[in-house]
Swiss-Prot record:
<feature type="active site" description="Proton donor">
    <location>
        <position position="117"/>
    </location>
</feature>
<dbReference type="InterPro" id="IPR050068">
    <property type="entry name" value="MurA_subfamily"/>
</dbReference>
<comment type="similarity">
    <text>Belongs to the EPSP synthase family. MurA subfamily.</text>
</comment>
<protein>
    <recommendedName>
        <fullName>UDP-N-acetylglucosamine 1-carboxyvinyltransferase</fullName>
        <ecNumber>2.5.1.7</ecNumber>
    </recommendedName>
</protein>
<keyword id="KW-0132">Cell division</keyword>
<keyword id="KW-0573">Peptidoglycan synthesis</keyword>
<dbReference type="GO" id="GO:0071555">
    <property type="term" value="P:cell wall organization"/>
</dbReference>
<dbReference type="GO" id="GO:0019277">
    <property type="term" value="P:UDP-N-acetylgalactosamine biosynthetic process"/>
</dbReference>
<keyword id="KW-0133">Cell shape</keyword>
<keyword id="KW-0808">Transferase</keyword>
<dbReference type="GO" id="GO:0008360">
    <property type="term" value="P:regulation of cell shape"/>
</dbReference>
<dbReference type="GO" id="GO:0009252">
    <property type="term" value="P:peptidoglycan biosynthetic process"/>
</dbReference>
<dbReference type="Pfam" id="PF00275">
    <property type="entry name" value="EPSP_synthase"/>
</dbReference>
<keyword id="KW-0670">Pyruvate</keyword>
<feature type="binding site">
    <location>
        <begin position="162"/>
        <end position="165"/>
    </location>
    <ligand>
        <name>UDP-N-acetyl-alpha-D-glucosamine</name>
    </ligand>
</feature>
<dbReference type="InterPro" id="IPR005750">
    <property type="entry name" value="UDP_GlcNAc_COvinyl_MurA"/>
</dbReference>
<keyword id="KW-0963">Cytoplasm</keyword>
């Protein structure tokens, strides 16, 4: 099993080129199944979850190729298989996005119930009910969700009982080829939904309202080829800004957009950090100052993103003062706190709230990553702790951060990957 060995404390400073967003790349890759012609995607991050998506697409009969420049060509014109199998789907919850494009274009699709990070309940019910309202028949059989339709799906008014990024994307994809108009109310507003809509429209879809809570899709008969650049990863951006804030450094994130990260930037400024933005850069200068504690409440976009909660937990455990962090999106998403406490942090969990008592310094320890965002907070903790920290189960990080140790070394971290022969 691979681990990271991280030495500290070090100040993290420099410039980081931000990768394409995993949370846009995955739905866009699955949405390419809707097209009868090849599509070309650029700025696709080199990640485990992207590789898994390639494997699922190839199982369906899609031709997927990545060239030397990193551009990805996808040709879904000869799909001959409609099942996303358990052995691939089990590692990644995003696999559910294979279902809507298959049933929309081919009137049948089958996806194993998905896996991924262990952070509480993420039911697929809203994906399923959306497809049912559009005329699909859904069966659950031996761990698989099977969707069929008698001809084209039909447009429908779909109200989301809970704001759901995943279900909004599923319904939006399916509706592009449906007969008639579909309206999604109480839709998620994340930038990755906007990017997916831009991609679908480039293929000939008729989507309006993405980025608001009401999305309207007029169905078309077919979608064609296009070229599209994946939006920058706002969570990777926020992660590196926090790296500067907790280490007393100054970091510029290049190739990113501040308007996708307003809630995070506001909280960093509240923590006493100087943040400056240009059209495609964000710079955080801590001026060597310890951050001030900030209260956080995770919310759907444009609120504070749940995927930045673990990083701000780290900020708060080394900040001046006491803070409360309330997690409203996912259950069981404070598993990093006991690990940070092993490093000398003072964090308490009360239901869906964490209380952080800031300490001046962390000390090294052997810690275990539990999910994607928790794992990066432990790596950053290792960068600012005295001594050698070992971070176990780093496969979580490879699912969502491209070339992370290279990027961290580029801003002054001392980090290496190593393997152990036996899993304890």
């Amino acid at each position: 099993m691979e681990k990271f060995r991280v030495h500290g404390p070090f100040t993290l400073s420099g410039t980081v080129d931000i990768s394409g967003a995993k949370n846009a790349a995955l739905p866009i890759l699955f949405a390419a199944v809707l097209a009868t012609e090849p599509v070309t995607l650029t700025n696709v991050p080199d990640l485990k979850d992207v590789d898994t998506t390639f494997k699922i697409l190839r199982k369906l009969g899609v031709v997927v190729e990545r060239d030397e420049s990193g551009a990805v060509q996808i040709d879904a014109s000869k799909i001959d298989h409609y099942v996303a199998p358990y052995e691939l789907v089990k590692t990644m919850r995003a696999s559910i996005w294979a279902l809507a494009p298959l049933v929309a274009r081919f009137h049948e699709g089958q996806v194993s119930l998905p896996g991924g990070c262990t952070i509480g309940a993420r039911p697929v019910d809203m994906h399923i009910s959306g497809l049912e309202k559009m005329g699909s028949v859904i069966e659950l059989d031996e761990g698989y969700v099977k969707a069929t339709s008698n001809g084209r799906l039909h447009g429908a008014r779909i109200y989301m009982d809970k704001v759901s990024v995943g279900a909004t994307l599923s319904v939006m994809m399916a509706a592009t080829l449906a007969e008639g108009t579909t309206t999604i109310e109480n839709a998620a507003r994340e930038p990755e939904i906007v990017d997916t809509a831009l991609f679908l429209n480039a293929m000939g879809a008729k989507i309006s309202g993405a980025g608001t809570d009401t999305i309207t899709i007029e169905g078309v008969e077919r979608l064609t080829g296009c070229q599209h650049r994946i939006v920058a990863d706002r969570i990777e951006t926020g992660t590196f800004l926090v790296a500067a804030a907790v280490s007393g450094g100054k970091i510029t994130c290049r190739g990113t957009k501040a308007d996708t990260l307003e809630a995070v930037i506001e909280k960093l400024r509240e923590a006493g950090m100087e943040v400056t933005v240009t059209e495609d850069t964000i710079t955080l200068d801590s001026k060597g100052q310890r951050p001030k504690a900030v209260n956080i409440r995770t919310m759907p976009h444009p609120g504070f993103p749940t995927d930045m909660q673990a990083q701000f937990t780290l900020l708060n455990v080394v900040a001046e003062g006491i803070s409360r962090i309330t997690e409203t999106i996912f259950e069981n998403r404070f598993m990093h706190i006991p690990e940070l406490n092993r490093m000398g942090a003072k964090g308490e969990i009360e239901g869906n709230t964490a209380i952080c008592h800031g300490v001046e310094k962390l000390k090294s320890a052997e810690v275990m990553a539990t999910d994607l965002r928790a794992s990066i907070s432990l790596v950053l903790a290792g960068c600012i702790a005295s001594g050698e920290t070992i971070v176990d189960r780093i496969y979580h990080i490879d699912r969502g951060y491209e070339h992370i140790e290279d990027k961290l070394r580029g801003i002054g971290a001392k980090i290496e990957r190593f393997s152990t022969k036996f899993e304890e």
